[in-house]
Amino acid sequence: MLAILDYKAGNQTSVRRALDHLGIPCVITADPAVIAGAHGVIFPGVGAAGQAMNELLTTGLDKVLKDQVQAGKPLLGICVGCQIMLDYSQENDTKALGIVPGECRLFNAAWTEEDGTPIRVPHMGWNSIVQKRPCELLKGIEPEAEFYFVHSYYPAPPESYVIATCTYGEEFCAIHGGPGLWAVQFHPEKSGRPGLALLRNFYAYCKEASRA
């Protein structure tokens, strides 16, 4: 079973629907015991980093998440979840979780597309990613597959944590982390076949890890 972290940050229901479609058992929960008993945790989020962190701190779920990561529980952050896994976000000048080193930065409106057109912020719509190093999440997914993005800020971890990038005016990190600890800036639950494949891969990894 996968635990979808319930901290009033938006897209838990759409994540659950995607997992239901795949036949993957899951529950939306804020119960530490349920989270501890799950094969893995999905940490979704939409909205503002400051508000999301306030919810985590108010409910104590920040500590629950960190404890599970320390215990080796697989974790998948999505969108704002991906951003606040880092140390800091420029959005609302937010001290974040610090699970992964790095910061989250606002897109530079001076960046331009290849034809010289200024980018629009937020970055919204389908865009391809380029894999930089092997990752279990991307098994069987076509190179440069397209995923659905909606965001004004982007993660900027150290290069050694960058798994895949996307280009929107300039190249930015689209997936970061390491084995069992991943974060994706796009929305896999809204990304059609590639997104469903990524969620399926995460669950397969979680099940295998639980047997180890």
UniProtKB/Swiss-Prot annotation:
Example GO BP:
L-histidine biosynthetic process
Look up the domain of life of the source: Bacteria
Q: How does it assemble?
A: Heterodimer of HisH and HisF.
- One matching Pfam family is GATase
Reactions catalysed: 5-[(5-phospho-1-deoxy-D-ribulos-1-ylimino)methylamino]-1-(5-phospho-beta-D-ribosyl)imidazole-4-carboxamide + L-glutamine = D-erythro-1-(imidazol-4-yl)glycerol 3-phosphate + 5-amino-1-(5-phospho-beta-D-ribosyl)imidazole-4-carboxamide + L-glutamate + H(+); L-glutamine + H2O = L-glutamate + NH4(+)
This protein's UniProt keywords: Amino-acid biosynthesis, Cytoplasm, Glutamine amidotransferase, Histidine biosynthesis, Hydrolase, Lyase
Task: Return the InterPro entries for the record.
Answer: Class_I_gatase-like (IPR029062), GATASE (IPR017926), Imidazole-glycPsynth_HisH (IPR010139)
* Gene3D superfamilies attached to this UniProt entry: 3.40.50.880
Which cell locations does it reside in? Cytoplasm
Residues forming the Glutamine amidotransferase type-1 domain are 1-212
Q: What is its main location?
A: cytoplasm
Give the protein name, as stated in the record: Imidazole glycerol phosphate synthase subunit HisH
Q: What task does this protein carry out?
A: IGPS catalyzes the conversion of PRFAR and glutamine to IGP, AICAR and glutamate. The HisH subunit catalyzes the hydrolysis of glutamine to glutamate and ammonia as part of the synthesis of IGP and AICAR. The resulting ammonia molecule is channeled to the active site of HisF.
Task: Return one GO MF term.
Answer: lyase activity
Keyword Iron on entry: no
> Pathway it acts in?
Amino-acid biosynthesis; L-histidine biosynthesis; L-histidine from 5-phospho-alpha-D-ribose 1-diphosphate: step 5/9
User: What cellular component GO annotations does this protein have?
Assistant: cytoplasm
Which residues are catalytic? C79, H187, E189
Task: Name the SUPFAM superfamilies for this protein.
Answer: Class I glutamine amidotransferase-like (SSF52317)
Task: State its Enzyme Commission number(s).
Answer: 4.3.2.10, 3.5.1.2
